[in-house]
From Swiss-Prot:
This is Light-independent protochlorophyllide reductase subunit N. It is an enzyme of class 1 (oxidoreductase). GO terms for biological process: light-independent bacteriochlorophyll biosynthetic process; photosynthesis, dark reaction. The lineage of its organism: Bacteria, Bacillati, Chloroflexota, Chloroflexia, Chloroflexales. Belongs to the BchN/ChlN family. The gene is bchN. It holds the Pfam family Oxidored_nitro. Its cofactor is [4Fe-4S] cluster. It catalyses: chlorophyllide a + oxidized 2[4Fe-4S]-[ferredoxin] + 2 ADP + 2 phosphate = protochlorophyllide a + reduced 2[4Fe-4S]-[ferredoxin] + 2 ATP + 2 H2O. It comes from the Bacteria. Binds 1 [4Fe-4S] cluster per heterodimer. The cluster is bound at the heterodimer interface by residues from both subunits. Protochlorophyllide reductase is composed of three subunits; BchL, BchN and BchB. Forms a heterotetramer of two BchB and two BchN subunits. Keywords: 4Fe-4S, ATP-binding, Bacteriochlorophyll biosynthesis, Chlorophyll biosynthesis, Iron, Iron-sulfur, Metal-binding, Nucleotide-binding, Oxidoreductase, Photosynthesis. Signal peptide: none annotated. Pathway: Porphyrin-containing compound metabolism; bacteriochlorophyll biosynthesis (light-independent).
Length: 444
């Protein structure tokens, strides 16, 4: 069943008129995602500094978080896994009250997020009731659906922000300020605050804020400016429940996206700004890197929901985007990005076997792939890099331009330096099971 909303007759463009998009995504039958959404805890617990994230899960969940995030238990991070044991299988509802009290005693959080995982979802644990049973007005416990059965790697942040909406104070209709939507590190947040002040745009804050007690007021006069391309549920809920305006623009990745983002945001406040010189200067600073990317064939096969703006940026750099696949595309929320990707092959839920054939035929210079397929693709001699790292990199706005472009060029330059060593069997021995100096075909 196709669930994404289709907006007839084009999309609303803040610059005026209807914005027609000729980019028509193809829907295939591949997997929805390949990396667990619980890993979003890795950047969210650092962003919301007075929070604690408790995952109800299994030993597999605990191993995933410890190995993926590289945090040892003695570091006392502000997240943990409440392990389900065999005895819990026969109980109607797990008891986490002891863990909640221990978390309050040792970490003193202002809010606790209770995240679901695959096993308790299958067990039909009633998470909302479980969270309500241990929640208090002083320290609310908020249920966050994050099971890998239903959510992509980055979508769990969308669930966390939805849980925070009731705690954002209401703003009066005449309070017209912007709220930046999406988790970015403090340096990037400061850059956006300074740029807004430079342009004369009033800022109410960020969602999520650095502290639970500092959530921004949101009301009918608020302009929501999404920073991340995977937050359409939060944006839709804010528009429906608070009556605020959701900015429809390019996401602030790269000089082109950042310029368009700020110009469209300023237009919401009745200001016309021209940032063409700022954009040109940003392109000039990364000219060495764009020269390397120009003409290169790039293939997106990742699953972070950041693929559309990344592909649009590479297209602006002069690269040839052979294909951009992503778990899903929301035609309304991603309208501006779709319009900018006219002529690029866009695929939802791509069939990986078909992608392998396309990769063999087109021979891309760089593949942005998911965590399952990157190493096997490298083993076949292609240049591939994880798409997951883009969720952790500071690549937003003017301050993030250099980090964004070098994330692509470093992969190409590294391969060029290692290529002379690639024929040595020592690099391939043991890479795939049963392989002695060679690589098992992914199609076998």
């Amino acid at each position: 069943m196709f669930l994404n909303p289709v907006v007839p007759n084009g999309y609303y463009n803040l610059r005026g008129g209807a914005m027609q998009s000729k980019a028509t995504p193809i829907r295939e039958d591949g997997i929805y995602h390949s990396f667990c959404g619980l890993v979003s805890v890795g950047w969210l617990y650092q962003k919301i500094k007075d929070s604690f994230f408790l995952i109800l899960g299994t030993h597999t969940c605990a191993h995933l978080l410890q190995n993926t995030l590289g945090v040892m238990i003695f570091a006392r991070p502000r997240f943990a896994v409440s392990l389900l044991e065999e005895s819990d299988l026969s109980s109607s509802q797990p008891d986490i009250s002891a863990q909640i009290e221990e978390i309050k005693r040792e970490h003193h959080p202002s809010v606790i997020f209770l995240l679901s995982s695959c096993t308790p979802e299958v067990m039909k644990v009633e998470f909302e009731g479980l969270a309500a049973s241990v929640s208090t007005p002083e320290v609310p416990v908020l249920f966050v659906p994050a099971s890998g059965l239903d959510y992509t790697f980055s979508q769990s942040e969308d669930s966390v922000l939805q849980a925070l909406i009731p705690f954002c104070p209401p703003a009066p209709p005449d309070d017209k300020r912007v709220v930046f939507l999406g988790s970015v590190n403090d340096a990037i947040a400061d850059d956006f605050s300074l740029e807004a002040a430079r342009l004369g745009i009033p800022v109410a804050g960020f969602l999520p804020a650095s502290h639970f007690t500092e959530l921004p007021p949101i009301g009918p006069g608020t302009v929501i400016a999404p920073l991340q391309p995977y937050l359409h549920k939060t944006a839709t809920q804010l528009r429906n429940e608070r009556g605020c305006t959701v900015l429809s623009s390019l996401f602030p990745f790269g000089p082109d996206g950042t310029r368009r983002f700020w110009e469209d945001l300023a237009a919401q406040f009745g200001m016309q700004v021209d940032l063409s010189e700022r954009e040109a200067a940003a392109w000039e600073r990364i000219k060495h890197h764009t020269d390397l990317l120009r003409g290169k064939k790039i293939f997106f096969a990742s699953d972070t929901l950041m693929e559309l703006p990344l592909a649009r940026f590479l297209k602006a750099c002069g690269a040839e985007v052979v294909e951009c696949s992503t778990p899903y595309i929301n035609r309304r929320f991603h309208a501006a990005e779709l319009a900018a990707l006219d002529g690029v092959r866009l695929v939802e839920q791509a069939n990986f076997h078909r992608q392998l054939r396309t990769i063999t035929e087109t021979k891309p210079d760089l593949i942005i792939s998911n965590i399952i397929t990157t190493n096997p693709l490298v083993g076949q001699g292609t240049v591939a890099k994880w798409g997951t790292e883009y969720c952790f990199l500071p690549i937003h706005g003017w301050a993030g331009v250099n980090n964004l472009v070098t994330s692509f060029t470093r992969a190409l330059q590294r391969h060029a330096r290692l290529d002379p060593l690639g024929s040595d069997p020592i690099w391939l021995t043991g890479m795939m099971p049963g392989s002695s100096g060679g690589v098992i075909s992914l199609q076998s």
